[in-house]
């Protein structure tokens, strides 16, 4: 195996790891996919180290090592990309793709974009469903739907302008709490506290928290702590938005 081929394999392995990490895969999956791809392409050994903002990968072939580093920029959770990358790796393992074909497939990957208004509607519907499950009447469900849908629209607009995620979460929580808080201020529905609590459920960073726990349990402690820290900061931003909205409405407590 010549060094040029090894360099090409190193590049595709680190690109694979980077794509998975950027789109929300847990650390064990990222490392395993990079290693499996390298071995399938004829590399003796692939070592991969992850940090919150970088991927470090080394390939070994005939006692010759090549190491490369790529900066990690979070692109949001997207399981479609993660699944497509895994399919490419499996295809290489089954000798359906060679190096050049696998590289072309990776280069052509594009994120699946849902219609933004469909996302707004579904977010509103899901939060309203939680309100219904919590015992809210139709008035509470309607208020929750409106508050969460408008908050999601605002979140999309702010995110398009690439604001800091902490600011995005704070403003989104502020908008949702301000609208749903009207039900508590003017005693609308059977239990206004349900609307206030359900309308901000779109901001719960459940996936990062689950991934952080999975990383820690599987030995990737630094990645687990990093992801847990990010999720905690985002939750803090949401709390700030809720507190500001409640203060503006002069609501002392939202506990029923």
Region annotations inferred by a language model:
Residues 1-97:
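Soluble N-terminal domains of membrane-associated systems
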């Amino acid at each position: 195996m010549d060094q040029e081929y090894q360099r090409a394999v190193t590049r595709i392995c680190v690109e694979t790891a980077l794509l998975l990490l950027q789109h929300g895969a847990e650390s064990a999956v990222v490392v395993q996919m990079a290693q499996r791809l390298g071995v399938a392409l004829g590399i003796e050994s692939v070592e991969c180290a992850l940090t919150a903002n970088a991927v470090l990968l080394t390939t070994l072939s005939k006692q010759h090592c090549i190491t490369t580093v790529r900066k990690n920029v979070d692109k949001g959770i997207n399981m479609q990309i993660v699944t497509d990358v895994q399919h490419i790796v499996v295809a290489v393992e089954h000798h359906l793709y060679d190096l050049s074909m696998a590289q072309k497939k990776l280069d052509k990957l594009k994120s699946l974009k849902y219609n933004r208004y469909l996302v707004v509607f579904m977010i509103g519907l899901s939060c309203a469903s939680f309100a219904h499950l919590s015992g809210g009447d139709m008035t509470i469900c309607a208020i929750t739907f409106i508050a969460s849908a408008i908050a999601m629209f605002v979140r999309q607009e702010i995110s398009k302008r690439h604001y800091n995620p902490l600011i995005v979460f704070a403003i989104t929580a502020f908008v949702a709490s301000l609208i749903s808080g009207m039900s508590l201020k003017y005693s609308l529905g059977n239990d206004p506290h349900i609307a206030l609590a359900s309308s901000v459920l779109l901001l719960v960073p459940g996936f990062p928290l689950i991934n952080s726990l999975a990383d820690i349990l599987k030995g990737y402690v630094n990645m687990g702590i990093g992801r847990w820290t990010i999720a905690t900061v985002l939750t803090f931003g949401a709390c700030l938005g809720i507190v500001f909205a409640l203060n503006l409405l002069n609501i002392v407590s939202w506990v029923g």
